[in-house]
């Protein structure tokens, strides 16, 4: 069974490597090389380099809707198309191209957290578990029939980054058996319950602004979920009465008994910066001021002795 893999994000790499080892991989479709960094160096997706090393043909169309892109994809003659973190919405023509189907590996337990920010959303929502879903692709976002799922508990210490890596490692454990069942004609199809669907749209940097009127527990989940992307930040007024920005990183503690006006600095010491929330307080230990580098609270206090007078915007 000839398989074409479509993927760009690093979360897709373990699945792609497993297909190189255990299947007849006809090709990789990934996003075009992009300018990266301050100097805008044209950089290939990491998965492209892996494919090249393995001698796998690579397609990088700007749009899979163009006649040339569709023609090149047909020439790979796929029996099955497998998608994970590709980055383009597929047309019905692509979905129907492979006779054995077009399936997707999605990093949540569907129908919960449909969309691009599924990993962050599971942490931010305080879910007890999350996982990987293998499903048939349909035109509606992440709404296709489920073939299989694998789950993992959320322990309350994960960040968006650590959970991303864990789910990436888990994917081959559910994907390979699904592919074998499709080849044998024994794959199951379970319709998603629309009434249970939730959505996790793509995040922007502005989504990381902290609302200090929210409970400390909720803000803490947001900080963990949005690390490393899009990050969390808060604004404050400096001595020159200009609004400044401060990023906040995981490494905090939650103090349920703390009381104060949301955004108020209750204390500033070696243990951290205690900020009042809508309920409870957040003891922050690692921050980054606008135009500076990441630092601990001791370093922050050394350069800003009047932290107690700061009030963060809600």
UniProtKB/Swiss-Prot annotation:
Coiled-coil regions listed: none
Domain of life according to the entry: Bacteria
GO molecular function: methionyl-tRNA formyltransferase activity
Keyword Protein biosynthesis appears in the UniProt entry: yes
Gene Ontology cellular-component terms listed: cytosol
Reactions that this protein is recorded to catalyse: L-methionyl-tRNA(fMet) + (6R)-10-formyltetrahydrofolate = N-formyl-L-methionyl-tRNA(fMet) + (6S)-5,6,7,8-tetrahydrofolate + H(+)
Keywords per UniProt: Protein biosynthesis, Transferase
UniProt keyword Protein biosynthesis present: yes
Binding site for (6S)-5,6,7,8-tetrahydrofolate: 108-111
Pfam families tied to this protein: Formyl_trans_C, Formyl_trans_N
EC number(s) recorded for this UniProt protein: 2.1.2.9
Known function: Attaches a formyl group to the free amino group of methionyl-tRNA(fMet). The formyl group appears to play a dual role in the initiator identity of N-formylmethionyl-tRNA by promoting its recognition by IF2 and preventing the misappropriation of this tRNA by the elongation apparatus.
Family in the record: Belongs to the Fmt family.
HAMAP family per the UniProt record, alphabetical: Formyl_trans
Name assigned to this protein: Methionyl-tRNA formyltransferase
């Amino acid at each position: 069974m000839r398989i074409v893999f479509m993927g760009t994000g690093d979360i897709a790499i373990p699945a792609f490597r497993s297909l190189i080892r255990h299947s007849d991989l006809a090709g990789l479709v990934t996003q075009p090389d992009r300018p990266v960094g301050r100097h805008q160096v044209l950089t290939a997706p990491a998965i492209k380099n892996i494919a090249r090393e393995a001698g796998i043909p690579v397609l990088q169309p700007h749009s899979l809707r163009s006649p040339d892109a569709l023609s090149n994809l047909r020439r790979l003659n796929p029996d099955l198309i497998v998608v994970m973190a590709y980055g383009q919405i597929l047309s019905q023509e692509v979905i129907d191209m492979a006779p054995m189907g077009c399936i997707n590996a999605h990093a949540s337990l569907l129908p919960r957290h449909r969309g691009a920010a599924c990993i962050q959303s599971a942490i931010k929502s305080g879910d007890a578990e999350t996982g990987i879903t293998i499903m048939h692709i349909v035109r509606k976002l992440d709404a296709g029939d489920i073939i299989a799922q694998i789950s993992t508990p959320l322990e309350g210490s994960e960040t968006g980054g650590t959970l991303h890596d864990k789910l990436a490692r888990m994917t081959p454990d559910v994907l390979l058996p699904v592919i074998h069942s499709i080849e044998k004609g024994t794959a199951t199809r379970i319709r998603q319950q629309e009434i249970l669907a939730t959505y996790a749209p793509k995040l922007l940097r502005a989504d990381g602004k902290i609302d200090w009127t929210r409970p400390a527990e909720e803000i803490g989940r947001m900080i963990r979920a949005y690390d490393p992307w899009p990050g969390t930040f808060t604004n404050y007024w400096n001595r020159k009465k200009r609004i400044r920005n401060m990023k906040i990183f995981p490494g905090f503690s939650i103090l349920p008994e703390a009381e104060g006006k949301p955004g108020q600095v209750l204390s500033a010491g070696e243990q951290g910066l205690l900020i009042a929330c809508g309920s409870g307080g957040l003891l922050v230990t690692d921050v980054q001021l606008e135009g500076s580098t990441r630092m601990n609270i001791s370093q922050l206090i050394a350069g800003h002795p009047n932290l107690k007078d700061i009030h963060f915007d809600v």
